[in-house]
Swiss-Prot record:
The lineage of its organism: Bacteria, Pseudomonadati, Pseudomonadota, Gammaproteobacteria, Alteromonadales. It comes from Alteromonas mediterranea (strain DSM 17117 / CIP 110805 / LMG 28347 / Deep ecotype). Part of the 50S ribosomal subunit. This is Large ribosomal subunit protein uL4. The gene is rplD. The keyword Ribonucleoprotein applies. Signal peptide: none annotated. PANTHER family: 50S RIBOSOMAL PROTEIN L4, LARGE RIBOSOMAL SUBUNIT PROTEIN UL4M. One of the primary rRNA binding proteins, this protein initially binds near the 5'-end of the 23S rRNA. It is important during the early stages of 50S assembly. It makes multiple contacts with different domains of the 23S rRNA in the assembled 50S subunit and ribosome. Forms part of the polypeptide exit tunnel.
Length: 201
């Protein structure tokens, strides 16, 4: 299949297997949820009765005082005691096979093409790290809510986009399923498309 280059009177030949797949909503959902779960810190922690400092001595004898029996001042029903069901650090990571991850990205790319949300150009960049220059370049393609994907890190582009709310710049190695679906449009250079196609092959 062919992708039309917006800044040239030509087309880019790409693989049907990568850019012409049927959209697998269940797979994309699973991978996106796993990606979000993996981003969670999971660093909450509380102390159980065994972990709270102190409480080694029985506060009073078992019988004869008229008071309720007690074995430690760190019981969960005491003020200053441990937590009955204490929260512990947890790893929220979900396993995603490489084949599934690649399949989800291919599925998203194919859907972006069907929805006319993927813009492919021969070259894209700015001469200086100026936001004004980037806005001007994006206006040529009528883009304002966009993910820009380049073959490698472009420092000028990255610095120029830092101050724009709905613009992000990634190299091919830095894209993920969430970033691909988070923006209204995805702008890719021809070299980035080819590099991504090789990575997903």
């Amino acid at each position: 299949m062919e992708l039309t280059l917006k800044d040239a009177q030509s087309a880019l030949e790409v693989s049907e297997a990568t850019f012409g797949r049927e959209f697998n909503e269940a797979l994309v959902h699973q991978v996106v949820v796993a990606y979000g779960a993996g981003a969670r810190q999971g660093t909450k922690a509380q102390k159980t009765r065994a972990e709270v400092r102190g409480g080694g001595k029985k506060p009073w004898r078992q019988k004869g005082t008229g008071r309720a029996r007690a074995g430690t001042i760190r019981s969960p029903i005491w003020v200053g005691g441990g937590r009955a069901f204490a929260a512990k650090p947890r790893d929220f990571d979900q396993k995603v096979n490489k084949k599934m991850y690649r399949g989800a990205i291919k599925s998203i790319l194919s859907e972006l093409i069907r929805q006319d949300r993927l813009v492919v150009v021969e070259k894209f960049g700015v001469d200086a790290p100026k936001t004004k220059a980037l806005i001007s370049a994006l206006n040529e393609y009528e883009l304002n809510d966009v993910l820009i994907v380049t073959p490698e890190v472009d420092e000028n582009l990255f610095l120029a986009a830092r101050n724009l709310y709905k613009v992000d710049v990634r190299d091919v190695a830095g894209i993920d399923p969430v970033s691909l679906i988070a923006f209204e449009k995805v702008l890719m250079t021809a070299d980035a498309v080819k590099q991504l196609e090789e990575a997903l092959a």
